[in-house]
Amino acid sequence: RLPEHKRAKYIGRVFQDPMTGTAATMQIEENLALARRRGARRTLRPGITRAERGEYRELLKILDLGLEDRLTAKVGLLSGGQRQALTLLMASLVKPRLLLLDEHTAALDPKTAAKVLDATEKIVQRDRLTTLMITHNMRDAIAHGNRLIMMYEGRIALDISGEEKKKLTVEDLLAKFGQATGSDEADDKLLLG
């Protein structure tokens, strides 16, 4: 079992707060370069190469936010949604063994949240990343991923996958949750997050 500081290089994380995953005073390309070098040996070679800039430009296109043309912009000038999308890209850049998404769209407006979820889906599928997405949005939980686990009082209450998950509706999910827990908490609070 590895200590936490050694395990960290195998895990990519995106938190709920868009401000926590990036360095605001650095440029987009500098943030990406830091993410690219995560877990690698440090060298004295100069900053960002032309090839890296080209790679970053291509990677940013998947986000569909126009950031590929703003590589030298300070991250602090980006919107919360743009920063969160950049954080997602940074967290998945070195293809972690586990990508942990902790309510990564909760602080975003619906349109930007949809773009970030779309980018998430593309990145996860393209790179075949094992991903744990924590969300209180039942629609998102049903629509994304191949397995849905619901917790109640610190324990797994539901574990749904395969064809059963594909056919699931929000109403079905809430009913199953209520049956599994004996709780009447399966209401709008769960549905809306």
Q: Across the structure, where does each feature detected by a protein language model lie?
A:
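Helix N-cap at the start of a conserved alpha-helix in ABC-type nucleotide-binding domains
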Residues: P110-T112
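Catalytic Walker B motif of ABC-type/P-loop ATPase nucleotide-binding domains
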Residues: L99-D102
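Helical segment within the ABC ATPase nucleotide-binding domain
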Residues: A114-D127
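Q-loop/switch helix immediately C-terminal to the Walker
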Residues: M26-R38
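ABC ATPase NBD coupling module
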Residues: R1-G12, T20, A24, R42-T49, ...
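H-loop/switch region of ABC-family ATPase nucleotide-binding domains
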Residues: T135-H136
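Conserved beta-strand-loop-alpha-helix hinge in the C-terminal portion
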Residues: R155-Q179
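ABC ATPase C-loop
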Residues: A91-S92
